[in-house]
């Protein structure tokens, strides 16, 4: 359907699941990170640009990306870093709910600088980097793992 037809219930549910959940995780994680640590969230290009059929999830991802920045600022003095990974589309359970998903995959293969889609392992390796000391100076970032598609959008 159209974004303008989003129900209040649907809007709030998307915000709760996709954005506010990070706030709760960060609050609880801080309790077990007395010496600092790292928190990583996943997002999607639809939080930065309007993506056909992504609708309320795009608004929720935009909220999540702002949440990452505010949590990075808030938890930085505790040596807790907060970052996001904006992953290219992967075949997941949630992807099944996105209309035209195969068309999106094809467009990335044709237009992204690397001319291919990314896989879950590439996203996982980026998360490992963000969770490791190799990224000790990185916080409040949204790293794109999408074969460069975000750069040409």
Write out the residue ranges for each language-model feature.
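Short C-terminal tail/terminal secondary-structure segment
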Residues: 128, 139-153
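A short, exposed helix-loop element centered on a Lys and neighboring polar residues
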Residues: 26-27, 69
């Amino acid at each position: 359907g159209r974004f303008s037809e989003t129900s209040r219930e649907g809007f709030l549910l998307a915000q709760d699941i996709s954005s506010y959940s990070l706030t709760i995780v960060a609050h609880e994680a801080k309790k077990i990170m007395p010496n600092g640590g790292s928190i990583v969230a996943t997002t999607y290009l639809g939080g930065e640009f309007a993506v056909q059929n992504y609708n309320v999830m795009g608004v929720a991802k935009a909220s999540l990306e702002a949440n990452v920045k505010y949590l990075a600022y808030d938890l930085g003095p505790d040596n807790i870093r907060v970052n996001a990974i904006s992953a290219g589309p992967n075949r997941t359970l949630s992807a099944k709910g996105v209309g035209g998903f195969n068309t999106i995959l094809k467009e990335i293969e044709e237009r992204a600088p690397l001319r291919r889609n990314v896989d879950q392992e590439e996203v996982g390796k980026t998360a490992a980097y963000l969770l490791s000391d190799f990224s000790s100076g990185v916080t409040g970032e949204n790293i794109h793992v999408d074969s460069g598609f975000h750069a040409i959008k």
